[in-house]
């Protein structure tokens, strides 16, 4: 794969954020690249990395033909982890998903783990290991997106994955999913740190407008979130920046070493919260001894622009409003946010009709990192008590 080389980066303490890199060629046999501004990632190394990466597919009541396309596009070497929060009654959509996955496995022999997010056996496992952050007041697992991602990471850790990547289940272009996973691998191969994140920026996000496709460069939520994330960073450095272009990158990946020390927020604030947390905790040289290895190696964040457009299910304006509110709540409640920045966020939310005068963005629920969970004990309880856990080829 040929990509623009990671020439420019901004450094905040132990955190390095690289400027957006474009994919130049997805597959190549070129060995010597004469231009220093181009990076060549050998195909063999990409495929070797794919075998160490679990791809997590969170889903909730998605169209089955979209799910089918996404699963078929994930490179065969990657174990697939499906965490579904779909209906189990009236109708039982989860059963339909299970049937689809069984058929997919019979055709492909792919390595798959599948579980329902609200499985009581999962909740029991979390209670057993003393991790109640993911549970509601009744002892059940909450229904948020972040909770599903956290479950996926634990399952990936249980099978020994070194990397975890996330892809949405509602993508209309299966070939895009195939590229996303290979882009993750390329990002990891460019890194010199065990603590690495790769975040994807879509080249275009098509919309149907007046009966034709319009290839929009930015989504509304992304524009707003990136603007305020860059303002947050600029206030800390006193230098204006536009470095962050992947604030809401649902398609992103991490090394397991980074994933297991990350706290996670719930619902749709999870992707911007990852950036805010890393800047808060590792953006200054404070309490270094707690994470000595992280500070020694540094955290590298790569942002890659895909060749493929991202065309996914339109979930409506209410979904967009919720994403904007929760994304900006992450920045608003950051300990780095100044009074001026908070005021600008409030004014923006009121202007868009998302908040009323006198209201504030909600405070986020944060789940602790998973690094203290006894993964063997957790997995043993899941296997012995789960109603929905399925393993194919693993």
Swiss-Prot record:
Catalytic reaction list: (2R)-3-phosphoglycerate + GDP-alpha-D-mannose = 2-O-(alpha-D-mannosyl)-3-phosphoglycerate + GDP + H(+)
Associated pathway: Carbohydrate biosynthesis; 2-(alpha-D-mannosyl)-D-glycerate biosynthesis; 2-(alpha-D-mannosyl)-D-glycerate from GDP-alpha-D-mannose (MPG route): step 1/2
Entry GO CC: cytoplasm
GO biological process: mannosylglycerate biosynthetic process
GO molecular function: mannosyl-3-phosphoglycerate synthase activity
Domain of life: Archaea
Keywords: Cytoplasm, Glycosyltransferase, Transferase
Main location: cytoplasm
Keyword Cytoplasm: yes
Record keyword Cytoplasm present: yes
InterPro entries referenced in this protein's UniProt entry, alphabetically: Nucleotide-diphossugar_trans, Osmo_MPG_synth
Free-text function comment from the UniProt entry: Transfers a mannosyl group from GDP-mannose to phosphoglycerate to form mannosyl-3-phosphoglycerate (MPG).
Family: Belongs to the glycosyltransferase 2 family.
Name of this chain's protein: Mannosyl-3-phosphoglycerate synthase
Organism: Pyrococcus furiosus (strain ATCC 43587 / DSM 3638 / JCM 8422 / Vc1)
The organism's taxonomic lineage, starting at the top: Archaea, Methanobacteriati, Methanobacteriota, Thermococci, Thermococcales
